[in-house]
Amino acid sequence: MIRCIRKLFTLAVVLVLLAAFGYSVVLPRVLPLQYRDIVEQYAAEYGLEEAFVYGVIFCESHFEPDVISSADAIGLMQVTEETGKWAAAQMGLDPATIDLTDPDTNIHIGCWYLSWLNEKFGGVSETVLAGYNAGHGSVARWLADEEMSWDGITLDEIPYEETKSYVKRVKLAEQAYRLRLRLQAYLEETPLGVYAD
């Protein structure tokens, strides 16, 4: 009986260690929480869910601040220079001085733009993401087309395959980050913060 209890105890310890290892080593690599303070600040400032912002960053740049796409989108949230300068002017910033490779600037402008799209498109996250990817002008045209939107608010059809795929990927990443952030909050509340990043 004592031998069985020792084996079960040993097994339990091994499982706990594996779970801790998996959380502390694997999860931060699969779903990183880089730039957390910046994401928290601007998500809160612009009424966005952190998981939503992380989903966009994950899909846009995989947390590489200096990445430039083939469409010349720059940084963590892949903001084009044109959109960045327009957004900066709308935000009361000097468009001539913005550096879209700077994580703070990029996330600030990206969150502002998501918030602007959110307001423009009635808070429908799929429509907001389509606007972020394909441009708000394209989405406005799609919403006006009865074949693509029955109510002028939601998109029943997204004609660009890239945008359709993008929306699905970001929504999936958002769900994963929602769980990751809940788990992170729970583990940060454990005694001594044993499993916190």
Name each model feature, range by range.
Residues K7-V25:
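Hydrophobic membrane-insertion alpha-helices, especially the h-region
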Residues A20-D197:
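Catalytic glycan-binding domains that act on GlcNAc-containing polysaccharides
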Residues M1-R6:
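Short, Lys/Arg-rich N-terminal segment immediately upstream of the first membrane anchor
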